[in-house]
Amino acid sequence: DMDGGALSKRFGPLYVWLVTLTVMSGGIAMGLASSMVNVAVPSVTGAFGVGLDQAQWMATGFLATMSVSMLVSSWLIEVLGQRITFIAILTIFGVGSFMSAVAPNIDILIAGRILQGAANGVGQPLAMFTMFSVFPPEKRGMAIGIQGLVSVLAPTFGPIVGGIAIDSISWRYLFFLPLPFCVPAMMMGLVFMPTKKLARRLPPFDWIGLAMVLIIVFSAFSAISNGPRTGWDADSVVYRLWGSAAGLVIFILWELRAPYPLLDLSL
């Protein structure tokens, strides 16, 4: 059980930069995965003989799951601590990458992308929380800048790196490309990430609210991704949009009465 203070004494002034390198390595892996798949859509549709509407779920499933998993990140950090959460999400991310790379069909590939998205959604708040916890107050602006740089540059280079991989080898290897950053991040995380004693009792969490958000987000993302192809007046698109709107109203009503709301609307 070593928190940031104990680890800082152990590793000295370099500790904040060791933590920065750790979370940046994980951030680069996840940032690349968030955008590089866009250039693989034509290859995937040809490989599996599916339409664009199915292939788009590689991106839609990733983004939707990432959006929802962000909401559970603070609870996970509180329960597991930074180190275990970091190792867990990188493991999930690695499993998702491997599933996508060796997928025998589009469904397994999308499932792998959903795992990647879930890990990414927790990873972004975790990285910022960790850097804030180890940087002194007067240097937290620098921490924000470093994190912002990774958040912008990694997704920017994703399509470039992905395109080179597809042209040179195969679209399947595209999903292995983040792993050279992921594996060192896990190894460094085992040493440098702060840890804590596991809570004996789980803190309360609004799981019903989270399930509602999951349904709302997937319905909305599905409608938005299919609208340009099928037409915004298509029944499937209209039903999903109305469903997500109705779900949003129900979610707001629930949050106003929930004992431990996911979003405190009274603020």
Regions found by a protein language model. Give the residues of each.
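Helix-loop-helix hairpins in multi-pass membrane proteins, especially solute transporters
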Residues: 70-208, 235
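Extracellular/periplasmic helix-loop-helix junction of adjacent transmembrane segments
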Residues: 40-70, 106-110
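Membrane-interface helix caps of multi-pass secondary transporters
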Residues: 33-51, 76, 131
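Cytosolic juxtamembrane N-terminal segment immediately preceding the first transmembrane helix
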Residues: 1-31, 46
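Hydrophobic transmembrane-helix bundles of small-molecule transporters
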Residues: 167-267
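Conserved kink/hinge residues within transmembrane alpha-helices of Major Facilitator Superfamily
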Residues: 31, 38, 63, 67-74, ...
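The feature captures the transmembrane alpha-helix scaffold of multi-pass secondary transporters
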Residues: 17-24, 36, 40, 94, ...
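Conserved extracellular-gate-facing transmembrane-helix segments in secondary transporters
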Residues: 26-40, 65, 224-228
